[in-house]
Design a protein with these regions (language model features):
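Phosphate/pyrophosphate-binding active-site loops
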Residues: 1-118, 122
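Short alpha-helical segments that sit at the start of domains
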Residues: 112-143
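Short, cationic-aromatic polyanion-contact patches
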Residues: 135-136, 183-208
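Short acidic, hydrophobic short linear motifs in intrinsically disordered regions
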Residues: 139, 143, 148-161
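Short hinge/loop at the helix->beta-strand junction immediately C-terminal to the helix-turn-helix recognition helix
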Residues: 151, 180-183
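Short coil turns linking two alpha-helices in DNA-binding domains
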Residues: 164-165
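Helix-turn-helix/homeodomain-like alpha-helical modules used for DNA recognition
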Residues: 208-214
Length: 214
């Protein structure tokens, strides 16, 4: 192995040891680990994506996120000049800009996530008013599934609700009649449905996360 390759292995090992520290505030630790990974640049390609994935992995490891992915990397890339300037400052010994950038991106991401939650709650409330079936019915229980899985087929409905696949049609039909579900294949068999209100909310969430600052 070349001297450069051996040195890269040692430096990455040092980064891993640093990332396991427990005496540094998690968000600061994550920001510095990310910047150090980008400075090492260990791979011929994909360092940026891997470095941003490291942020998500460390956030999960330190309990800052649990069941969701917070789009911090998208927040960093909203202002690419600020992000690259922060990485450059880190290489020259100043950690403050990258810590500030990661903290700001996390704050933006959390705000974006809260907007998504509010949008989905509004959708769920409108469904409850539009669906006439009784509480606890399979059709009502399907509403909770649709917030997690806005595109479904018969197998999905049967598995999620624990019902016979032959009963899927009568479960889905009230939601179709209420304008909640839409069948989009046009097939008589192997049909699939989607919830436009949920996919629209998710699209808006993604658009906000990807929006660049001028």
């Amino acid at each position: 192995e070349s001297t450069a390759a051996i040195l890269a292995i040692l430096i990455v090992g040092d980064l891993v040891a640093f990332a396991r520290r427990t005496d540094v505030a998690p968000l600061i630790l994550i920001a510095v680990a990310h910047a150090q990974f980008e400075a090492i640049h260990p791979f011929p390609d994909g360092n940026g994506r891997t470095g941003r994935a490291l942020i998500q992995s460390m956030m999960r490891h330190y309990g800052l996120t649990t069941n969701v992915t917070v789009p911090v990397s998208a927040g960093l890339l909203q202002n690419t000049q600020r992000y690259f300037d922060a990485l450059d400052a880190y290489r020259h010994g100043d950690v403050t800009p990258i810590v500030s950038a990661v903290a700001g991106a996390a704050q933006v991401a959390v705000g974006n996530g809260r907007l998504l939650v509010a949008d989905l709650r509004g959708v769920a409330d409108s469904w409850a008013a539009r669906l006439p079936s009784r509480q606890g019915s399979a059709s009502r229980r399907l509403l909770d599934v649709l917030l997690r899985r806005p595109v479904i087929d018969s197998d999905t409905v049967a598995a999620e609700l624990g019902i016979n696949i032959g009963n899927v049609g009568r479960t889905v039909q009230p939601l179709v009649e209420a304008g909640i579900l839409r069948e989009f294949t046009g097939f008589n068999r192997n049909r699939m449905w989607h919830v436009k209100e949920v996919t629209d909310a998710l699209d808006a969430f993604a658009d906000r996360a990807a929006r660049r600052l001028s």
